[in-house]
């Protein structure tokens, strides 16, 4: 059966000497794996069209199991995402988070909206690292956990100025008054906790200007990755590349 669907490539894996297996997140919010034959060969014209983040109309044959890609009518290559290794890596982290949050057969229209929003924001100049944080905050429930950043998990104190870190012992933010009860709590700036709470709750269509200091973004990114490791056992391939890039700069 010949299928035509708009979508965004969220995963691309080399298969053999000349083929690729790509996964698109289609406009309905479903993951569609496709075999792209000879996609690594320049002459086929599919090499550029099967890169990560390509948004287009995908035409493919599907009977049972994996479909076979025929052609792609590209709407956007998202070139700006490919021009900087850090930008590309954090955009990949966002895409990987969404891809791994979905099981085969899941339909999640919101994930498609989230991915489109994030890629457009990154292309317009918003920090790719910050947008990866937004994605990971929005996808937490799909990985089976949540996190609270606006009240002390020990006392219930919701005075934002009193919150000084995150406690894995008590599974939530912790206030300075209760800090002695968890000496291993991760110390975070009050602003980091506040912005994590805001970004977690704010609908994406209300996120207009996102100008946050880099030190705060770094703190948010670090604690989010810790939450995913602790509560979901998740390690991201994209983050490994980011860590390697950071080590090279030291």
Swiss-Prot record:
Keywords: DNA damage, DNA recombination, DNA repair. It holds the Pfam family RecO_C. GO terms for cellular component: bacterial nucleoid. It comes from the Bacteria. GO terms for biological process: DNA recombination; double-strand break repair. InterPro entries: ARFGAP/RecO (IPR037278), DNA_rep/recomb_RecO_N (IPR022572), NA-bd_OB-fold (IPR012340), RecO (IPR003717), RecO_C (IPR042242). HAMAP family: RecO. Involved in DNA repair and RecF pathway recombination. Belongs to the RecO family. NCBIfam families: reco. This is DNA repair protein RecO. It comes from Staphylococcus aureus (strain bovine RF122 / ET3-1). The gene is recO.
